[in-house]
Each structure stands twice: as structure tokens, then as C-alpha cells.
UniProtKB/Swiss-Prot annotation:
Gene that this polypeptide is encoded by: htpG
Renumbered residue ranges of the record's region C: 562-636
Annotated segments matching region B: 345-561
Listed PROSITE patterns: HSP90
Keywords per UniProt: ATP-binding, Chaperone, Cytoplasm, Nucleotide-binding, Stress response
Organism expressing this protein natively: Pseudomonas fluorescens (strain SBW25)
UniProt name for this protein: Chaperone protein HtpG
NCBIfam families membership: PRK05218.1
Signal peptide region: none
Subunit note: Homodimer.
Length: 636
């Protein structure tokens, strides 16, 4: 190819993050060098997809060359590998933007997440989508010649860098649209300037690319004859994976396709491939990743499926096909019913999309149910990564609330390590005879809820309680009313009624005790005044003297903290003070003649109950003063 003289040549510096990334990548990914070709082919495939899409409305972009392909060649003597595509190409500005910076939100977070552990870092880097920069794993100099479709031949661009902090860029003539990347191999990397080696890498990683990938045909001249003209041959299958029958596709092919679309180095946990025919016609291939992306909780992070219409790529990150709580799902949806000029705005309003969304959501939930049932250990890993996001489900997806609830996992009083492994179905299978409720307790930490006085009566009766300590849990439970016909009960809320789990004698005895302590209830109420909404005898306690319960309609502590943190006004609410009439401290309080001392003891018990509930004291100094006064009296 003849190139004209370079003009407007300048040397620019890489964005800081690129420098760091290059350094890390060259070291972290070195053990799996051959992936550079997969990454570059993946980029070339995206460039061709973009051209196909833009050419629908501007056919002149094809410039008379509608046969789209990728070519990989090599030169043993020059020690180069060249990859060429006739896709959309780049302008000078594109080259500076795409090859000099990482145009992706969350870059700083990504850098913070790098640990120095090679295995973990290579996963993170892969997940971040190193793409083009992987060329520097095997090359000490990379040159890019490109021209964006639709620009003049004189507006080509030549970019080159040694990957050490800066790059050169110049304007050149380039007759053909698209991009050519020339890798000047490092010493010791000559193995890649070889037809068979390159063929094997293409077969291994890029067989699923729905675009012909050509390599020079291996041909030798017969003795005494000239070397024949260069011929090319297609070395990949070049058909869209999701359009092929499932029976013909190997697991390895599904896994490689996932790595291509998910920019991931790990195999997915699970996948679901379906073709729907009838009123709506579409194919879908959905994947559950093995690990959460670092930007899972950033609202602006990229999410959504790749959308194709009749096998023509239309857009990345089409968000309208799955609800937000399934934003970690990767995959492809290919519809026959949408028009090719579909936009994101249209997707949000199209009734066809609503039908597809509900079917795809059900498909994902079925896939997760299957994973939980058949691969409980794998599901445990899934839950660690994505459990908090799944907990957003019941609020967002009313139609599938019961299905999502079945996929949730909790810690409970059955275990002693706080691991969230108990499903609601398991909980009910272990429930006591006559138990028609699912009991739970929310709190800040596992240690706090595990040792909460609210659990005393449940321990005594051997009733399992779910322990919820994620920040989202109280909010989740405001949307989960029941599961399998059994309602949820917060053991710290309202007046605890164990229903059939208390015998008639126990109920009668509790009523009599409450009646006999009416005088004490009034005295404590007068002493605590506005600090409480109510004082009553407790049915929950066996060992502790007192606890604070939450009113039936009041906000719990977790919810109050979330609202306060987001700057919202939180309504005032006062706790209910419950005491254990059989506790020696309460008996002593009941017999106390001095009103001043009675007041001090009541306040100390109230403050201790607040601390046990994980709350902070409104007046810690007053608590310390009362406690010290009591200690002095006891020591006299």
C-alpha cells in the first residue's frame, strides 16, 4: 500500500490511567499473551458492526465495498503481525480519543481496585476491556493506519507508539476505509509471525465472530516456478453463534462468545440460549457472569444487552430488555420484529419490548433457579457477588416477586458464621409445627443481631429467625409481605404474638403477669416520659431485663440511617420500652421506694436497651453520670 507524506505530525502523552494500565497489563496478562489477537479481532468486529449500522441510513459509507471482513497477516522477516478491517475506521480525533485515553466512567475506581495480585488483576483488567492496549503485551511498537468511512482519502491517520507514555499522530493518505494495525513484535515473540500459530488462535478465540476472518493461504511454489499470487482463506466459522442450533454448539464456544461480548477473562457461571417463534420472533443468548464488575453499583455504569435486528448489530447496552436488578446479565438479543432504525427512546415505549422484557426476565430467573438447585456451591458464589442487587428485585418487579423471593439467601440463627445461605423454602421446611410466620430481625452487623435480646424467646422455643444485616434489607422487607402464603414478621416490631407457638397456659400466664405489673408500667412511663411511646411487659425476653421495640408503623433504624444519609427528613418516632418482669433488676426496680433512684435505674435500663439495639445514646454524659452514681452507691 502506498502511503503519502505524513502531515500535521504531533507527539501527545497518554492519559495517566492509560500509562498505569499499560504497565499493569504488560505484566499481569503476560502469562496469556495470545489474547492480544482476540482483543484486536473483537475491536475489528465492533468496527464492522458500526459500519453496517451506519450504512443502513447512509449507504454511501460502504464506498462500493460491501464485502466486510477482517484480515490477519504476518511477515517473518520484518517480525510483524498485521490486522486489517474494512469497518467504520477512525478520524484523527477518534484516534486521539480512543487510543490515547480510556473513555469509560469509573476509571479511578478501577485503578483503586487493582491489588497487585496478578490473577485478580488480570481478571479486572480483562473486565475493564483492555482491547487495543493488549497489543503491547507482544509488541514493542504498534502502528495504526485508519480512515473513517465517508472522509476523503487524504484524511487518513497514522498513530504510533512504543507504549511508554506517549504516542505520535499524523495525517496521511489512505485509499481504503477502515483500520490496519501493525504490531512490531518484541524480541522473543517471533512465534506469532507464523500462519499456523495465528490460525490456531483465531480458531480458539474468535471462531464465533460473525464475520469472515481471513489469513494468507499456505502455499509454496513448485520447483522452478514463481511463487503464486497471494490468496486468502477464511479460517473461522463466520456465523452468528446465537443463530445456530443449540445442539451444534460446544460449551467452549459459548464460553468464548461470552468472553468476547462480556470483555471478561473468566468463564460465565451459566447461560441460556433460546429461539422464540410465533407472534414474536427473536433469539436470545443470556449469560450470568462468575464475578461482579467493579462498577456494579454505579448508576451510570454500562449495562444492558447487545441488540441485533435480523442479525444486523443495532446497539450496545440496550437497557430496555431486562429490569435494573438484573443489570449484571450479559448477552445478545436478536429480533425479527423491530425496525433497523430503532432508537433507545423507541425501545422505552414499544409494547413489543415489554413482552420481550417479561419473557427474558423470566428466562433469567429460571436460569438462576436451575443454578441454585443443581449447583448450590456455584450459586453461593453468585449470591456473594450479586445478592445485594437481587434484593432490589421485589420492589422493582412486582410480577416476579415470589420467584425472586425464592432466590434470596439469608443468614439465620441456625448458622454461626453469618453466611447468607438459607433460602425461604429451606426456612419453611425447618419451621416448627404450627408456625405460620417467617421471623426475621434487621440490624447493623451480624454480631449485633446474633446477640440481640429480641431473639431470647425464639432460642428458648427453638424457632429459627432470619438475620438481615445488609443496608438494603429493611427496605427490601417493606416490599416482601409473604412467601408461600406465610407472612413475614419483624421480631423487633410491634407486640410480638407467636400465635400457635405459645400454648394456652403460656398466654394466660402472660396476661396475668401483665395485669399484676400495671402499677410498675405506669411508674416507668412517668419516669421515662417523652423518651418512649409506650411501656409494657415483654413476651420476648428470658435473660435480659429490657429491650426497645419499634412501633408497627415506625421506621426501623437501618431505614432511618439510609434516609438521613440521603438528606431526607426523617419523621420522629419513639420506641416502645418492654421489660422482663422475672428479671432480678426489674424486681429490684419494682421494690424501689426512692423516686429519684427509681428514675435513675429506669433511665439506665432504657439506655442499655438502646445500646443493645445498636442505637446511639441521645445523652451519653447523662448515662455515664447515672451509672457512676449507682456504682458509688453499690460500693459504699
Amino acid at each position: 500500500m502506498t502511503m503519502s507524506v505524513e502531515t500535521q505530525k504531533e507527539t501527545l502523552g497518554f492519559q495517566t490511567e492509560v500509562k498505569q494500565l499499560l504497565h499493569l497489563m504488560i505484566h499481569s496478562l503476560y502469562s496469556n499473551k495470545e489474547i492480544f489477537l482476540r482483543e484486536l479481532i473483537s475491536n475489528a468486529s465492533d468496527a464492522v458492526d458500526k459500519l453496517r449500522f451506519e450504512a443502513l441510513s447512509k449507504p454511501e459509507l460502504l464506498e462500493g465495498g460491501a464485502e466486510l471482513k477482517i484480515r490477519v497477516s504476518f511477515d517473518k522477516d520484518a517480525k510483524t503481525v498485521t490486522l486489517e478491517d474494512n469497518g467504520i475506521g477512525m478520524s484523527r480525533e477518534d484516534a486521539i480519543t480512543h487510543l490515547g485515553t480510556i473513555a469509560k466512567s469509573g476509571t479511578a475506581d478501577f485503578m483503586k481496585n487493582l491489588s497487585g495480585d496478578q490473577k485478580k488483576d488480570s481478571h479486572l483488567i480483562g473486565q475493564f476491556g483492555v482491547g487495543f492496549y493488549s497489543a503491547f503485551i507482544v509488541a514493542d511498537k504498534v502502528e495504526v493506519f485508519s480512515r473513517r468511512a465517508g472522509l476523503d482519502a487524504s484524511e487518513g491517520v497514522h498513530w504510533s507508539s512504543k507504549g511508554e507514555g506517549e504516542f505520535e499522530i499524523a495525517t496521511v493518505d489512505k485509499a481504503d476505509r477502515g483500520t490496519r494495525i501493525v504490531l512490531h513484535l518484541k524480541d522473543g515473540e517471533d512465534e506469532f509471525a507464523d500462519g499456523w500459530r495465528l490460525r490456531n488462535i483465531v480458531k480458539k478465540y474468535s471462531d464465533h465472530i460473525a464475520l469472515p476472518i481471513e489469513l494468507p493461504k499456505e502455499q509454496a511454489a513448485a520447483e522452478g516456478e514463481e511463487t503464486p499470487a497471494q490468496e486468502w482463506e477464511v479460517v473461522n466459522r463466520a456465523s452468528a453463534l446465537w443463530t445456530r442450533p443449540r445442539t451444534e454448539i460446544k460449551d467452549e464456544e459459548y464460553q468464548e462468545f461470552y468472553k468476547h461480548i462480556g470483555h471478561d477473562y473468566e468463564n460465565p457461571l451459566s447461560w441460556s440460549h433460546n429461539k422464540v417463534e410465533g407472534k414474536l420472533e427473536y433469539s436470545s443468548l443470556l449469560y450470568v457472569p462468575a464475578r461482579a464488575p467493579f462498577d456494579l453499583y454505579q448508576r451510570e455504569a454500562p449495562k444492558g444487552l447487545k441488540l441485533y435486528v435480523q442479525r444486523v448489530f443495532v446497539m450496545d447496552q440496550a437497557e430496555s430488555f431486562l429490569p435494573l436488578y438484573l443489570r449484571f446479565i450479559k448477552g445478545v438479543v436478536d429480533s425479527n420484529d423491530l425496525s433497523l432504525n430503532v432508537s433507545r427512546e423507541i425501545l422505552q415505549k414499544d409494547p413489543i419490548i415489554d413482552s420481550m422484557k417479561s419473557a427474558l426476565t423470566k428466562r433469567v430467573l429460571d436460569m438462576l433457579e436451575k443454578l441454585a438447585k443443581n449447583e448450590p456451591e456455584q450459586y453461593k458464589g453468585f449470591w456473594k457477588n450479586f445478592g445485594q442487587v437481587m434484593k432490589e428485585g421485589p420492589a422493582e418487579d412486582f410480577a416476579n416477586k415470589e420467584k425472586i423471593a425464592g432466590l434470596l439467601r439469608f443468614a439465620s440463627t441456625q448458622g454461626d458464621d453469618g453466611e447468607q445461605v438459607v433460602s425461604l423454602a429451606e426456612y419453611l421446611a425447618r419451621a416448627k409445627e404450627g408456625q405460620d410466620k417467617i421471623y426475621y430481625l434487621t440490624g447493623e452487623t451480624y454480631a449485633q443481631v446474633k446477640n440481640s435480646p429480641h431473639l431470647e424467646v425464639f432460642r428458648k422455643k427453638g424457632i429459627e429467625v432470619l438475620l438481615l444485616t445488609d443496608r438494603i434489607d429493611e427496605w427490601l422487607m417493606s416490599y416482601l409481605n409473604e412467601f408461600d402464603g406465610k407472612s413475614f414478621v419483624d421480631v423487633a416490631r410491634g407486640d410480638l404474638d407467636l400465635g400457635n407457638l405459645d400454648s394456652e397456659e403460656e398466654k394466660k400466664e402472660a396476661e396475668e403477669v401483665a395485669k399484676s405489673k400495671e402499677g410498675l408500667v405506669e411508674r416507668i412511663k412517668a419516669s421515662l416520659g417523652d423518651a418512649v411511646s409506650e411501656v409494657r411487659v415483654s413476651h420476648r425476653l428470658t435473660d435480659s431485663p429490657a429491650i426497645l421495640a419499634i412501633g408497627e408503623q415506625d421506621l426501623g433504624m437501618q431505614m432511618r440511617q439510609i434516609l438521613e444519609a440521603s438528606g431526607q427528613k426523617v419523621p420522629d418516632s419513639k420506641p416502645i420500652f418492654e421489660f422482663n418482669p422475672a428479671h432480678p433488676l426489674i424486681e429490684k426496680l419494682d421494690g424501689e421506694q426512692s423516686e429519684e433512684r427509681f428514675g435513675d435505674l429506669s433511665h439506665i435500663l432504657f439506655d442499655q436497651a438502646a445500646l443493645a439495639a445498636g442505637d446511639s445514646l441521645k445523652d451519653p454524659a447523662a448515662y455515664v453520670r447515672r451509672l457512676n452514681k449507682l456504682l458509688v452507691e453499690l460500693s459504699v
